[in-house]
Amino acid sequence: MERTNDSTSTEFFLVGLSAHPKLQTVFFVLILWMYLMILLGNGVLISVIIFDSHLHTPMYFFLCNLSFLDVCYTSSSVPLILASFLAVKKKVSFSGCMVQMFISFAMGATECMILGTMALDRYVAICYPLRYPVIMSKGAYVAMAAGSWVTGLVDSVVQTAFAMQLPFCANNVIKHFVCEILAILKLACADISINVISMTGSNLIVLVIPLLVISISYIFIVATILRIPSTEGKHKAFSTCSAHLTVVIIFYGTIFFMYAKPESKASVDSGNEDIIEALISLFYGVMTPMLNPLIYSLRNKDVKAAVKNILCRKNFSDGK
């Protein structure tokens, strides 16, 4: 790879599943189908929340943000994945790679923060139900969401800026499906200690702190639910949190594997380990956004009722 002072002249090559051409066709069809399901599921959920006034509450406001983040995240990476499966030379420009990495990292970091704010919302709703409308006012929950977005974007700017300063001498083969930051750091022909320190700080801010907020919130939530005398009351209270808790487990289970322990350039050379990490990252990047609308809507009477109302209104207007 030729490297000049102009970073846009640099090209990377994505390995993906190049060693398994038959699997590429299978994965292309599978990922395309999943991406369409992501757009459909999250698009419907966003539309329902926007157009049904009964869902104009803090919980659904955060859920709308979460769905929008899922659409943005997958749209920044899935088209590149699909194109790489079809292309003979799976190359991407340096600038294109950095843009894709920035968007993906920003959306992922923001989603971590949003999940933390959703836990706080459920904590207030269950532990302080009478004060909930006052504490979670429109100004409060909009500010919480805005803070999450700003944190995610700033964090991504910092990580991307540090990555762009690294020299890439000869090895330009990314052992991944997309321009994933850890895979790119492994290609640098310079000391990446600053990047590792920066990533560790990033993990603390957008992974550990939100997870602590979620954990502490649920400790108080469980304690409050256990004090509810009736079984029906306990079930109703827990049902409002079960979807969020399920998403948190899936989301953090995969993302911690990828980002909790940044590795130095020389620490991993195994091709098998690289492809396993890439597949887990693919699961995090595609499977989770596809499942989120299902998890939040299948057992949610409000969402199902809102969908029915919109469909009934559409059928009524079409019949006129």
Swiss-Prot record:
Disulfide cross-links: C97-C189
CDD domains in the record: 7tmA_OR13-like
Gene Ontology cellular component annotations, sorted alphabetically: plasma membrane
Subcellular localization, as worded in the UniProt entry: Cell membrane
UniProt topological domain (Extracellular) ranges: 1-25, 76-99, 161-197, 259-277
Pfam families: 7tm_4
Domain of life: Eukaryota
Matches recorded under InterPro entries: GPCR_Rhodpsn, GPCR_Rhodpsn_7TM, Olfact_rcpt
Cytoplasmic side: 47-54, 121-139, 218-237, 299-320
GO MF annotation terms: G protein-coupled receptor activity; olfactory receptor activity
Any one biological process term the GO annotation gives: detection of chemical stimulus involved in sensory perception of smell
Primary residence: membrane
Keyword set, alphabetical order: Cell membrane, Disulfide bond, G-protein coupled receptor, Glycoprotein, Membrane, Olfaction, Receptor, Sensory transduction, Transducer, Transmembrane, Transmembrane helix
Membrane topology, from the record: Multi-pass membrane protein
TM helices/strands, residue ranges: 26-46, 55-75, 100-120, 140-160, 198-217, 238-258, 278-298
Glycosylated residues, chain numbering: N5
Family: Belongs to the G-protein coupled receptor 1 family.
Function comment: Odorant receptor.
Protein name (Swiss-Prot/TrEMBL): Olfactory receptor 13C8
Organism: Homo sapiens (Human)
